[in-house]
Amino acid sequence: MIRKLLLILGISVASLANGQSLATATFAAGCFWCAEEAFEKVPGVVSVISGYTDGKTQKPSYEEVSSGRTGHTEAVEVKFDPGKVSYEKLLDVFWVNHDPSYTDRQFCDHGSQYRPGIYWHDEEQKRLADASRVKYGKLKTFKQPIVTPIVKASQFWPAEDYHQDYYKKNPVRYKVYSTGCGRYSRLDELWGKLRK
């Protein structure tokens, strides 16, 4: 069963030669296209799936989530090898790739479907997420308080195929969107050298 799942994900058993199994992390950082790009660049991350979480309907579509009526937020599910990258490192990537001072928007995207969040899968992830919020709150790189919630993970629904790897499949459109949205200039303003 595990071997079949790994093959479905496009992961060879050899990639887990260290004897550990993959772990899962779930984050919402606004537009899932941008979050997917940020996490896919991290060594030790095996896959990143764009999708929806923290909502009240089954198998939501992009159109339904975009309406704001399903309660879902755009998120990414990150599969990673904990022998190669720590959950703490993924938390660092998360923090510097979103604006933690808003509860219902990220950059030019407004609405509850763009709310940020850390969705923990076990008590250790919760503990580490709480500690990371304290750590980033003490940095005082900006004036507003951190309002990003840390919530128990719920059902994650993969988004439609055309959303997966959007930044790779549509690089020009993605660049126009992410630049026009002011995402990177705002992140640099918030986090400065921490983003490098």
Protein language model features and the residues they cover:
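Flexible coil/turn and secondary-structure edge motifs
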Residues: I2, N18-K196
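Hydrophobic h-region of N-terminal signal peptides that target proteins for export
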Residues: L7-G19
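Short, low-complexity, intrinsically disordered N-terminal peptides in bacterial proteins
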Residues: M1-I2, G10
